[in-house]
């Protein structure tokens, strides 16, 4: 499977082995910068696949968080959470549709139950 080849390639890189080693030794928080937005989902999936710890991925804005969440859903459709910033909602528009509110509540419940591997949110 192509995904396995990607993960195997990453495992052979000293930089990623170093990241895994630091996390395993509880050296946290850990900041990984310099990644392209398209690489974030790959790295998050790699870390999630190699560690038995929950991962929190914080992006710089809401749009980036949603894109990263969508990319991660490809790898782990049932194990990724996205908590949308409540302040970005348009209350007048959403007054008739409670769909977004329901998704947020479901995500918060899953967060409380620790029913996830990767949590994606923005710093906003």
Q: What label would you give each PLM region?
A:
Residues 1-124:
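ASCE RecA-like P-loop NTPase motor cores
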